[in-house]
Amino acid sequence: MTEATGIVGEFLTLKEGTDADLLAMQCGDFYEFFAEDAEIVADELDLKVSQKSSHGSSYPMAGVPVDDLTPYVSALVERGYRVAIADQHETENGHAREITRVVTPGTHLETGDESAQYLAAVVREASRDSGDTYGIAATDVTTGQFQVTQLDDADAGEALTELYTFGPAEILPGPELRNDDEFLDRLRERTDAALTLHDSASFEPGRASHTVREQFGSETVDSVGIGDQNVAVRAAGAVLSYVEDTGVGTLAAVTRLQAYGERDHVDLDATTQRNLELTETMQGDSSGSLFDTIDHTVTAAGGRLLQQWLQRPRRNRAELQRRQSCVAALSEAAMARERIRETLSDAYDLERLAARATSGSADARDLRAVQETLALLGQVADAVTETERLAESPLADALDGADREAADSLAAELDSALVADPPGTVRQGGLFKRGHDDDLDEIIDEHEAALEWLETLPDREKERTGITHLSVDRNKTDGYYIQVGKSETDAVPEKYQHIKTLKNSKRYTTPELDEKERDVLRLEERRHDMEYEHFQRLRARVAEHATLLQDVGRTLAELDAFASLAVHAVENDWARPAVVDGNELSIEAGRHPVVEQTTEFVPNDLYMDDDRQFLIVTGPNMSGKSTYMRQAALITLLAQVGSFVPARSATVGLVDGIFTRVGALDELAQGRSTFMVEMQELSNILHSATEESLVILDEVGRGTATFDGISIAWAATEYIVNSIQSKTLFATHYHELTALGEELPTVENVHVAVDGEPRSAGSDGDVTFLRTVRDGPTDRSYGVHVADLAGVPEPVVDRSQAVLDRLRDDKAIEIRGSEQNDGGTTQAVFDLDSGQFRDGAAQSGGAAAGSTAEPVATDGDPEHAPGEAAAEGPKGDERAASLDSETEAVLSELTELDVNETPPVELMAKVQEWQAELDDE
């Protein structure tokens, strides 16, 4: 291949020196992409491709204007590309270009997304004796936040859950995780984050510790308690190293180090956040999510903070009570609340403006936005102090956290310097007010006097020459010129020097005009240079106050989030919950916070404590079982956000995690069936939940055969009750499980009530779903009735009801057996009342198997508990003879299996093994 020279050669040389996916190189007023990069960018952004010749070869070229680079780079980063930027600057020998930054998903300052934009690193240190130790660090370079934690004696699931709470845009796996395919696969499944392999040396303990202490100071590192947490420090050092490597000046914005422990936040894994639809619905839309429902914020920072609160609920009761008190005060001070919200609606995003200032990318409009927002702090403070209810609340203390005097001083400095509406570019002048600097004022006066001379020149020349069609203008080619209409060119003075002829006019210059042009250009350049120098100093002053901007921005964001929660509480009649230690969960007239916005909602009570830990929820299809359980989880979550809740009253015992197995999300695209996903989610819950957790289980086991499903559901229930002891709500159509309410002391049954008679063969029935939850079990699901409501053809509905009635009358289900010589199939029939097999019976063509049931006697005979083989009846020998060897082997294993002593996941695997054996016969 011919070696390129010139601009293309320079581009290719720079590209070889970076590991970025794409390179944008400034060439004058454009950023250009060459060669393969040009083809990629053109395809992704629909740009026109031209050709650039170099050393006998032709290279594709695509470009974007300098002023339009940001949106194009943002689009590329959103598509997963890492884009290097090579800026052009002047030297004594002409132009020079160098890579100044690499824009990646986790280091993108100019993002248009108002939500947090986290870059995270995860490190693992293996342990032979117990669980591993994980270090996790995450920073949002757009706001300067930096958070770090260490998980001791943890597993991969806990680390992944912790990572997911940040919703990172980019993740740096530590060296020991890069070859762990299982971990990386799970990481890809749970997040959309880009995975980047950063320099392994940056993860080394010594180097990482030096990097962290250099950035934040040894005193800060030790005071937040991570000085001796080597694994956490390794992750933190890698994040800081990556930020420094990818962006000049970006690291200066990272000033707020926060360390948190494992007990600071509620565990919300990816499955739970999805199932509870915290920030987006199951369909992937933000509209209709919990955040969308309760978000009444008027600032970007306030909305971002409220979303973070939802995704990372707290376990600190004092902090939750502080938040509740702020919401309560604003709820009771309507006029002051609206005054504050109206003031905040004029606020800009100070946290992100601070990051832009420290990185050197802030323009004059950004600094004016800083000034205007800092000035609002005093107005908000006045609204609080002038309202007795607010002045006596923690809101007053929150405002004390921001240095109002320093904020007022910086705001005054910026206001005295900048014009009210500065231009968008900082190189074209017009940024500063008169009086900011005497030398600058003198240059501005001279420049504007020269411009005024030019502005009045046409009138003077018309009067002097008598020419009516005369104007003065300027362009890049001709500079300043006098233009005269063709009909009057004979009247031009002799000193007019002709420079160009057009169709209807001619252009001239004069010695005076040439001299004045030189003066204007000289003064213009001097003015622009001086203004830019002053602007750089002013921007540096703002950057020095980055921590102040972040503090004020955080304060205003908190006020906005509190006001948003107060607005929603007042408009929807929400109540302040009592947040307590212990396992009590008491909800009076609770409602679902999202569903109640669109549907007339029937409130329901819920009570759980140490003696009532596990609720089995039964009831018809479409009756509201899932909604009832979700609202319990959401009320708990909202209480641990610090919000009021949709209920008449509520007492919420603090939980350490909320875990859900809800719905039937099929992930066939990843090669996993609905049932496999369900079992993996159940496995995660059984491994992760503790006695302080809240667990929501919806229809566990329904994705497989009936016996398998009941066995798994039964065993999981026993395991949770006996081993984990977490508060659990379990909705099921396996009515056999309700027997556990009599056998296990902390298990209770509740059901969603129905009014009327169910449909039966020959009768339409009349059923009303009351949506009311009552104590005790139910034994009907009304599935055929729901099928009728859904519009299933009447013959199918009628036949379904007839089959259902027969099964109920017979109280038996039939199990597949061995083939007979006549082509029929012998069925092993299991009697639901006796808990024993009946005589085998041949049926031509093979009768359909029944639809439900665990082999358990309905009279509660303890000899026939789930997982144990029914006692052999008088016809036991005949039954054995009628079954094939595979079925008999499975029954034999089932007889010997102790369900109570078998872990649920192992039991699940055994059931799947039996199912495979029977399917293969």
Swiss-Prot record:
GO biological processes: mismatch repair
Q: Does the keyword ATP-binding apply?
A: yes
One Pfam entry name:
MutS_I
The entry's keywords: ATP-binding, DNA damage, DNA repair, DNA-binding, Nucleotide-binding
Q: What does this protein do?
A: This protein is involved in the repair of mismatches in DNA. It is possible that it carries out the mismatch recognition step. This protein has a weak ATPase activity.
- Organism name: Haloarcula marismortui (strain ATCC 43049 / DSM 3752 / JCM 8966 / VKM B-1809) (Halobacterium marismortui)
Q: Which SMART domains match?
A: MUTSac (SM00534), MUTSd (SM00533)
Q: Which PROSITE patterns match?
A: DNA_MISMATCH_REPAIR_2
Name by which UniProt lists this protein? DNA mismatch repair protein MutS 1
Region ranges (Disordered):
837-887
GO molecular-function terms, A-Z: ATP binding; ATP-dependent DNA damage sensor activity; damaged DNA binding; mismatched DNA binding
Which residue ranges have biased composition labelled Low complexity? 840-853
Looking up HAMAP family in the UniProt record yields: MutS
